Amino acid sequence: MAPGRMPDPYQSLGDTCMNSSRLKTLVATLALTLGGAAFAQNQLLNVSYDVAREFYKDYNAAFAAHYKKTTGKDVKVDQSHAGSSAQARAVNDGLDADVVTFNTTTDVEFLANNGVVAKDWAKRFPHDASPTTSTMLFLVRNGNPKNIKDWDDLIKPGVQVVVVNPKTGGNGRYAYLAAWGAVREKGGTDAQAADFVGKFYKNVPVLAKGGRDATSIFLQRNIGDVLITFESEVVSVDREFGKGKVDAVYPSVSITAENPVAVVERTVAKKGTGALAKAYLDYLYSDEAQEIAAKHAIRPRSEAVLKKHADQFKPIKQFTVAKYFGSLTEAQKVHFNDGGQFDKLYTPGK
């Protein structure tokens, strides 16, 4: 200000107003930032496999109610569904999932190997971090006209088997491993298992691309005498095509198909959602969640819930992937990679 000049009260007022305005803006911005962070800490993204959308829709509602009751806080769970392996790639490439819930352990291992989930993810939750399972069974046409009861019936002359290509779908990989393991469970050697699986695929008229394609081939195109699929798909078939179209046949032995889950460490470290993500996956083991799984024909780990739904989940002897194959990762290398056992045993058109 020039010497002898009186201060301009309006200039001072303007400076004060401007400073006040800036302060309000700063406070508002800070509030929004903190509020957004707080909201993010009560919001999860579950990236899951395609056919689990109905189960998780019901589970999320149950978890939100449980979380509100026990903590007094609201929580919002968003879902993303697609093929399990495609989802794993999306998360690896940057999709900010807080948790992943897949249907094959190889997809979680892929993320673990890339540092996205913990290396020891399978030890973070009970049952090797698989709160639910399914198994492989046979769907036959109503009345079971070919009298198919067990694995040996699938290699008989004149029996056509519909199955997913094990190189393109987890459904197919589990079917292949179940057939192989069924021989081993009866005391057979790997050589005898390979011989059986080779005969098995000679009765496969066409390999389906995926589970839904296999169902379409069997029920819409009317090809085959038996469809090998997940137990959890029986409800879907009845819902889409109507009850009475097929009969479910439980073989003497089958494989345990695990549904693994994991916290995405990369995301929760950034968002501060680690405790919430763990609580979300922990609650999958609760009786309420296990009941919801049973409702959707997903086999619960809880023996009590399983027994309660014994009319739906028939008793069946099961073996794990680890028992004969080490892991799904090892099975992939030995059996399903190019030049592996499957390529040696399967010849299209024969």
Predicted regions and their residues:
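Short helix-loop capping/hinge motifs at secondary-structure junctions, enriched
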Residues: 143-149, 168, 181-189, 267-275
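Ligand-binding pocket segment of bilobal, Venus flytrap-like solute-binding proteins
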Residues: 186-252
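Periplasmic-binding protein-like
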Residues: 130-134, 197-201, 208-209, 241-274, ...
